[in-house]
């Protein structure tokens, strides 16, 4: 029995790739024991619980960096306790390898891994490296990345492998719609609006505005996020409660409007759904904009700047993507192929990391 630990917390952008990798590897390697490690935020508990996973929860709820006063002191204490808990966990389970998926929860695992001499891999989903990724690179760990760029690291300091995506099955259109419980299936184009795991009232508001324009006659907009609730605020616009089973929504989407989180963009790419990406302007070091530029560069969609772009540009680009979906008709694309491909590459990197030890996991 081989043991692999996947460390991911914070938001769905870190957690979903870990779940995607773990599920793919577990289905292919029955003798592989996969454990998950998370922080203690309610959102993290919700995401893992929905996937039927019981992770090891570290006693921390966020990074002490960027905070001050009592909150910063409290979080530093949580970090120290988490390092101790992670060190104890590594000592008890003796994993063959550990993969860090970034976010605040990865720092205690990185420190504990150095203490217990656990082989560590780091995956960076975004086109801008996070603090743990940069620290790992300075320690001689070559980050595995989701994109062809990982600022400020230069070529040769990282290796692009893609972002693991959750294995999901494409459903027939009517079956997918019925799972949402929204009544009769509408005719015309369906646009999926994704604000990330934290939701986005700004995107919901923008869609509500443009949905009334004559250019979008016959379109239906499915707006997912906690702000909308389960409602039908106007003709052609449905609010979908936050959900983690995305298969029905991806199966319905002809086009999407989305924030620039790497996990979301990778899943849209795997499903061949053209997307208008609206990067969240407050993202760390503007990493969502960097993700969006590379998403556009690979021909998967277009970018609209929320602060500087006009409504006319938003409308024109969304219409352009709607025409792209008509021309390419990618409804037969199997998203499971992309999930399997990235996981196989990842497995190869894990095995390479174990060279020199008992690294033959395939016996």
Q: Language-model segments: what does each one mean?
A:
Residues 298-299, 303-305, 309-326:
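C-terminal "capping" alpha-helix adjacent to the active site of nucleotide-linked donor transferases
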Residues 3-9, 31-81, 161-163, 305-307:
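Conserved nucleotide-sugar phosphate-binding/catalytic loop shared by glycosyltransferases and other
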Residues 35, 54, 114-174, 182:
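Active-site-proximal region of nucleotide-activated glycan assembly enzymes
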Residues 37, 42-45, 51, 173-256, ...:
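Donor-nucleotide binding loops and adjacent catalytic segments primarily
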Residues 26, 84-98, 106-121, 134-138:
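Glycosyltransferases and closely related glycan-assembly transferases
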Residues 95-97, 251-266, 273-274:
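Acidic donor-binding loop of glycosyltransferase active sites
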Residues 317-323, 336-363:
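C-terminal alpha-helical cap of glycosyltransferases
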Residues 258, 274-285:
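Short hydrophobic beta-strand element within catalytic cores of glycosyltransferases
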């Amino acid at each position: 029995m081989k043991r692999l630990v996947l460390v991911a917390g914070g938001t769905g952008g870190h957690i979903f790739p870990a779940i995607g990798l773990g599920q793919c590897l577990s289905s292919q390697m029955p003798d592989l024991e996969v454990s998950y490690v998370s922080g203690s935020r309610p959102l993290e508990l919700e995401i893992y619980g929905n996937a039927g996973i019981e992770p090891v929860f570290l006693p921390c709820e966020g990074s002490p960096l960027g905070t001050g006063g009592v909150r910063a002191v409290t979080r530093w204490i949580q970090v120290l306790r988490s390092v101790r808990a992670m060190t104890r966990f590594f000592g008890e389970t003796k994993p063959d390898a550990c993969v860090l998926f970034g976010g605040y929860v990865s720092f205690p695992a990185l420190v504990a891994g150095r203490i217990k001499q656990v082989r560590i891999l780091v995956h960076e989903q975004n086109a801008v490296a996070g603090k743990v990724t940069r620290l790992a690179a300075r320690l001689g760990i070559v980050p595995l990345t989701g994109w062809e760029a990982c600022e400020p690291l230069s070529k040769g300091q990282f290796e692009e492998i893609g972002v693991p995506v959750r294995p999901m099955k494409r459903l027939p259109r009517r079956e997918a719609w019925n799972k949402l419980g929204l009544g009769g299936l509408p005719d015309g184009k369906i646009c999926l609006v994704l604000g990330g795991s934290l939701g986005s009232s700004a995107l919901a508001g923008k869609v509500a505005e443009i949905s009334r324009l004559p250019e979008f006659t016959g379109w239906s907009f499915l707006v997912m996020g906690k702000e909308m609730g389960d409602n039908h605020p106007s003709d052609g616009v449905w609010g979908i409660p936050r959900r983690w089973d995305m298969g029905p929504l991806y199966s319905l989407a002809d086009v999407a409007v989305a924030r620039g989180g790497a996990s979301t963009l990778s899943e849209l790419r795997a499903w061949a759904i053209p997307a208008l990406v609206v990067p969240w302007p407050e993202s760390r070091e503007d990493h969502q904009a960097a993700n969006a530029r590379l998403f556009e560069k690979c021909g998967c969609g277009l970018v609209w700047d929320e602060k500087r772009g006009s409504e006319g540009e938003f409308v024109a680009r969304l219409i352009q993507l709607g025409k792209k979906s008509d021309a390419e008709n990618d409804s037969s694309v199997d998203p499971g192929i992309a999930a399997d491909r990235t996981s196989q590459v990842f497995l190869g990197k894990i095995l390479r990391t174990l060279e020199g030890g008992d690294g033959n996991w395939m016996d």
